[in-house]
């Protein structure tokens, strides 16, 4: 199957993005322009320190234009910038975002946006207050609307290369169903928050009337039953954000009793099932999907196996629907927890060319 030439109209789309124009194209067409992505993880979504000092509190250096340029120039044309807002807002009912914080977020957004990247900003690590159950939903809904109204107003003049993702892994933290699809109550609360995000952003007008907005499922799950039980709002410019560390035994699990260190095509069935599920439930209904988080941890430098896995992952994402995939990079490669890092932010070089080159080569 011949892959589309996504570079064909590159100069035109870059000019339009920088002009601040939102083109008269469908959400499927916009997402179809994207190749592959990278997450600026554990930076603007870090917590535990006052004010803007939180950005470096989890061990990553302050984000620079040089970093983002290096990632974009490598071939990652989608830059997802996870942002935690909850620790940078005032009290109810206004929940005013700190001026210094939203200015810093905008500065980092501009690093990628000015390069011509597709930039995704979201609301990340908000689980302590964003609790999707009936006891908390009214207050959560109010705070969600207040935050997104301010963010949408701040960025309303940006072109269609800026994308808003309303919720990251919305779930009841610590509950038995946290990572197993939630409850009926929890899924209905997530539906409500998706709709509140959508309505709030659209009401700010300007380019936000047609901006691509990403909904999600409970915990951003790719489980078939969760996807089928998640409402799809009526809107011509939405897509879905899904997280898929598949298969978990290879990508994430560190339990030596049943984890996978090595990869071959005998495991491809799980990837085919994942992408087929997304195609049938979203793409076949003209709803685009972006896998906004995927990746495989470094297990004793198994880079060759990770390269084989990511080659298969991206191949099936492309062949079964043209789904852009955004690697979760938390900056950690050889020390610390969850070793998803592929880019060294201290030196602006790549920890592993083996994995990185496999991503870029298969996403063409």
Swiss-Prot record:
One of its GO terms (molecular function) is endo-1,4-beta-xylanase activity. GO terms for biological process: cellulose catabolic process; xylan catabolic process. It is an enzyme of class 3 (hydrolase). It catalyses: Endohydrolysis of (1->4)-beta-D-glucosidic linkages in cellulose, lichenin and cereal beta-D-glucans; Endohydrolysis of (1->4)-beta-D-xylosidic linkages in xylans. One of its GO terms (cellular component) is cell surface. The keyword Lipoprotein does not apply. Pfam families: Cellulase (PF00150). InterPro entries: Glyco_hydro_5, Glyco_hydro_5_CS, Glycoside_hydrolase_SF, Glycosyl_hydrolase_5. Its EC number is 3.2.1.4, 3.2.1.8. The keyword Cytoplasm applies. The active site is at 169 (proton donor), 293 (nucleophile). It is found in: Cytoplasm. SUPFAM superfamilies: (Trans)glycosidases. PROSITE patterns: GLYCOSYL_HYDROL_F5. Its main location: cytoplasm. Hydrolyzes both carboxymethylcellulose and xylan. Probably has a role in hydrolyzing oligosaccharides derived from cellulose, which are transported across the cell wall. Belongs to the glycosyl hydrolase 5 (cellulase A) family. PANTHER family: ENDOGLUCANASE, PUTATIVE (AFU_ORTHOLOGUE AFUA_5G01830)-RELATED (PTHR31297:SF41), GLUCAN ENDO-1,6-BETA-GLUCOSIDASE B (PTHR31297). This is Endoglucanase A. It comes from Ruminococcus albus.
């Amino acid at each position: 199957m011949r892959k589309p030439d996504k570079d064909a109209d590159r100069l035109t789309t870059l000019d339009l993005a920088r002009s601040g124009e939102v083109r008269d194209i469908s959400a499927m067409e916009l997402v179809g322009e994207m190749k592959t992505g990278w997450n600026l993880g554990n930076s603007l979504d870090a917590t535990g320190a006052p004010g803007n000092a939180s950005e470096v509190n989890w061990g990553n250096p302050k984000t620079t234009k040089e970093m983002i340029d290096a990632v974009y120039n490598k071939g990652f044309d989608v830059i997802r910038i996870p942002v935690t807002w909850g620790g940078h807002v005032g009290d109810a009912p206004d929940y005013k975002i700190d001026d210094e914080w939203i200015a810093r977020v905008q500065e980092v957004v501009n690093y990628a946006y000015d390069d011509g990247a597709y930039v995704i900003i979201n609301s990340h690590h908000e689980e302590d207050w964003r609790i999707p159950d009936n006891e908390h939903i009214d207050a959560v809904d109010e705070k969600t609307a207040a935050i997104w109204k301010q963010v949408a107003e701040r960025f309303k003049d940006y072109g269609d290369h800026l994308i808003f993702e309303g919720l990251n892994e919305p779930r009841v933290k610590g509950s038995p169903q946290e990572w197993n699809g939630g409850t009926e109550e929890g899924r209905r609360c997530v539906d409500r928050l998706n709709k509140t995000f959508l309505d709030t952003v659209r009401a700010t007008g300007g380019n936000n009337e047609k901006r691509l907005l990403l909904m999600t499922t409970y915990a951003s799950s790719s489980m078939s039953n969760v996807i089928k039980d998640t409402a799809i709002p009526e809107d011509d410019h939405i897509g879905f954000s899904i997280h898929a560390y598949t298969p978990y035994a290879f990508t994430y699990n560190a339990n030596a009793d049943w984890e996978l260190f090595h990869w071959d095509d005998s495991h491809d069935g799980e990837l085919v099932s994942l992408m087929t599920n997304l195609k049938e439930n979203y793409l076949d209904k003209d709803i685009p999907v972006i896998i906004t988080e995927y990746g495989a941890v470094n297990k004793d430098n198994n880079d060759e196996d990770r390269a084989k896995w990511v080659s298969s992952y991206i191949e099936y994402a492309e062949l079964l629907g043209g789904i852009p995939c955004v690697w979760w990079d938390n900056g950690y490669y050889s020390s610390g927890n969850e070793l998803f890092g592929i880019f060294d932010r201290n030196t602006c070089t790549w920890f592993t060319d083996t994995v990185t080159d496999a991503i870029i080569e298969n996403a063409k």
